[in-house]
Amino acid sequence: MQRTERDPHPDASEREALSRRDLLAAAAAAVAAGSCGASGDDLAAAAAEASAAEPDAPAGMRYRTLGRTGVRVSEIGFGGVPIDDPEVLLYAAERGVNYVDTSPCYRGGRSERTIGEALAKRRDRFVVTTKWCPHHFGKEPRKQVFLDSLDGSLERLRTDHVDVVLNHEVGKRSDGLGFARLENPEMLEAFETAKKAGKVRFLGASGHDGDLMDVMTRAVDSGHFDVLLCRYSFLDYPDQQKLIDRAHAAGVGFVCMKTLAGAKGADLERFRGRNATFKQAALKWVLANERVSNLVISISSRRQVDEYAAASGSAMTLAERAALAEYAAEFSDQICRFCNRCEPACPHDVRIADALRFSMYFHEYGERERALESYAALEPAARAGSCAACPGYCVPACSYGLPVRDLLLRAHAALGRERGSATA
């Protein structure tokens, strides 16, 4: 196979700029300074001004405006992937969480069904987001396919409307169609039809691809999308702030996911016995950016609700910044950024970023069922089964110095067993 998309091997100057020493130093410095490059005190003041407590909300939870939608959303959003008990979501509402994110492709629709049990009791307490998933559609989906998908979500959620529907996993690598899924006129027509019928209020886009900046910039500039759902953490690449600023200027809400930077060693020893956790520190770092609307994080228990809700309305301490800097120094060259820079170097067309993302779900997030189903949904050739006999062309192509081949072998060993069904 001839690889002509881009040179997968950075030139000497680029490799030098991204040397392990400099990379770790840059990561640690970014964490220590806080997001946006401002001082910690300035960030805390700006974030406090951007967020506010609602009159009838529980003490502690802060709220921000979701871009031009005008909707007030809790700083901590409920990620619905692992939920099994609707009472956990109702408990989150008691703690002030009003934003819930789900999808028909989460656990075969079980996430939506469980959330629907809670919505049937207290729909008025929640801002509900679901998704249009590429797993359900062909290469050129028609308008009715989108409408049928939304109707299925509404039935499972036991509601007559959702607040936001996200065109999910847009990007060049997600389906090989470039920006076609983002700008599909059938999707846009379906949204307008559903909106007129009162089934949805706002349209958004979400994605994991390495071309995140290009795709989401296009989404902002198109004027079609009211909300973006993007990864954002203290280990993400520095120019992501440009996208956040662009979205803010256009009035597009920016919701953050993948906020824990891999969650390796999620409760580090230096936090044990204190009033904060690593996860709280990571969430506070995200919320220090006054231009993000809120964040979503997977929640399955009341304990997690309490832990994550405590991150709202409180500024990072110096000890927390130092701990995140130590984490960055320890794990920066072990965590995939899903940038896709290494993929053109692969002679087997392995979906490297996807495989490592699903491995993260399995090993770090503990979401084993989701990881197994997602990996099984990849075409067999796109999985990492061919990596054992490959010398590892991906390794020198990684800008972050990751042992990519070893990570892929680990992923395939955990996820490669056959399953009877793919992601729904």
Predicted segments with their positions:
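Conserved, mostly hydrophobic/aromatic
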Residues: L66, F78, V100, I115, ...
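Glycine-rich, proline-tolerant flexible connector loops at the mouths of alpha/beta enzymes
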Residues: D101-A118, K172-G176
